[in-house]
Every structure is written in C-alpha cells, then in structure tokens.
A protein has these predicted regions:
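Short helix/turn-capping signatures at newly exposed starts of structured segments
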Residues: 2-139, 178-196
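A charged, solvent-exposed segment within the mature domains of Sec-exported extracytoplasmic proteins
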Residues: 129-191
Length: 196
C-alpha cells in the first residue's frame, strides 16, 4: 500500500514553498533588510564591516585607507570639533545594515571620530545590533533643547558610541564613535566654559 498526499495538500505545500519566502522578504523587517542589502550589492554599492568596540585613536589615515581600500574617499582639511581633517566615502552596507555615508575624522593623522549615516528605516535594526554587540547602553544623555531627545551611549575600550534613541521628523539618521581623547577634551572644554 502506497501512501499518497491528497492533491489539495500538494498544492498548499507548493504555494507555501513559493510564496512563503516572498512574503517573508516583503513583510518582515529582517526580510526587507536582506532585500535592501542584496539590491545595494547588485547595484555595486560597497559593503564594509567595522568593529566599533575595537576602534581607537591609534589608527592612522593610511591604515584605514589600506583596510578600506575599496572605498573612494573624498578628503578635506577642515578644522572642527572632531579634528582637522575628514574623509567621506559613500557606502551601501555597514555591518549588514543598509547605509549611505561613512565619515572619518583625524587630528594629527590619528582617528578621532567616525560618523555613519544610515537609512532611517533601519534605525531599530542598527540599534538592536548595537545592543547585541556592545550590550546595554549607559543612562541616556539629555540634550539641551526644549524637547530633549534621548541619546544612547555605549562605552568602548577606546571611545564612546552615540546614537539617538528615536528619530523624529527631519532628524539625521547617524551614529557617532568618538575617541576617548576627543570625549575627555570635549568634557574639559565644556567644564571650563561652564565655570566662566
């Protein structure tokens, strides 16, 4: 005696096999992220991986150029709070999350800050990835505005990672890594200004 599946079961199974992945790709956050990264990769956007916990101000511009040689860096000397030189590169994917630009800042040839501009609809996924990689953030920092936005901060061995807890309206979707030297220098300047 041979066992045969009824025709209706076969059809339902085929429908699930064909449409299940399509529905997952279209209607789940993870599926949409994977679809976005695949499309970005197909269109030639660069994918990079960067361990934010291991970043330090010991890295030089030449070392980062060598590690991320596939990126087309556009560099400019410009003195600001983050350094005296910055380089910008267009990217498509950062640690598996769709992104737009990566900006690195240098002072005296050493890395002081990294700014990642990502796609706003991937904010929660990037935040979730940071929670997994860096653990729970420290107490949110309150900004000095009438409507304070909470900024999440994670301490790393050599710096601080900052990201808004939630994006509102025209907020720029960005993540910052600041070197310990830059953070302590900024705090020292702020305390001097506060005592004047």
């Amino acid at each position: 005696m041979t066992y045969r599946l009824p025709l209706i079961y076969k059809k339902l199974l085929i429908l699930c096999v064909v449409f299940g992945p399509i529905l997952w790709l279209m209607f789940t956050e993870d599926g949409q992220r994977r679809t976005d990264t695949l499309v970005l990769w197909l269109f030639g956007e660069e994918e990079i991986s960067m361990d934010l916990a291991a970043l330090s101000n010991q890295y030089t511009e030449q070392e980062l150029d060598k590690v991320y040689a596939q990126l087309k860096w556009h560099c400019q000397d410009h003195v600001d709070a983050y350094g005296e030189r910055h380089c910008v590169a267009r990217i498509g994917i950062f640690n598996g999350i769709p992104a737009r630009y990566l900006t690195v800042f240098y002072r005296d040839g050493r890395l002081t800050a990294v700014k990642l501009q990502y796609r706003a609809h991937n904010h929660d996924q990037l935040q979730s990835q940071l929670l997994t990689l860096l653990g729970e953030p420290k107490q949110p920092v309150q900004t000095n505005t009438e409507d304070p936005d909470q900024v999440l901060q994670w301490r790393t061995h050599f710096g601080l990672v900052l990201m808004k807890q939630a994006l509102h309206g025209n907020d720029e979707p960005a993540l910052l890594w600041l070197s310990s030297g830059l953070v302590s220098g900024t705090l020292a300047t702020a305390s001097k200004n506060a005592t004047k």
